[in-house]
Amino acid sequence: LQFSSLDEARYHETLSASAMTSVKDPAHVLVLGGGDGLLAREILRYPSVTDITVVDIDPDVTELARSNRLLKDLNHASLSDPRVKVVNDDAFTYVQDSKATYDVVLIDLVDPSNEKLAKLYSTEFYRNIEARLAPEGVMVTQATSTFFSPHAFSTVASTVAAAQPDRQILPFSTNIPSFGEWGFILSTKTPQNLISQPLPKGLTYQDRQTLEFIMRTKPARTEAMEPSTLLHPRIVEVYNQDMRQWRYY
């Protein structure tokens, strides 16, 4: 678990709203990571949603999110909602083997700090995700800090672009006081649908004006980087080089 209850809504509302407002009546949603139930909480605000699949490798995390009183209060008991199915599996394996189709895929995985995590930021991973998307489906992934790890952020953008050449890639960011400026990458085949659907009730941070600003008016800048692959997991080296100057140990 890695969030502050004081400002986690900035992250989860942005990650979810950027995709959910860019697909007409999204019904089927896949969450990769998100075992704390906070992203599922946000997705359940959208009345068109019929099912959410949360794929998190750690059963202890998802059980804690279901049973801990404080976490349940924060995630609104989202993982116990009948529309939510929890799958304790590796995200890479799941999208590789799954035959399901989703309107929205949201990726809420930890940063690529080691080789075990590199596959979750590879062209192969993003290519498998594209195969799971409906024709007008949208994918959004968290993409590390645009301030602390700008080259890693750019590498994620370049990797998604290489894996999904027929889709438009949109990098953007929002400020989260606990973590700083945080980056996201959206991919879509229908950019004309961006932020075309209404936001749900109950949001504490995100609104249409803010969403328009971060996604259209001032999208995050990236530079061309070599894509990260299973054979050449460049993202790990780039991420750790970015972070080295900020570490005190």
Name what the model sees in each region:
Residues 1-7, 11, 167-249:
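Soluble small-group transferase modules, centered on the S-adenosyl donor enzyme superfamily
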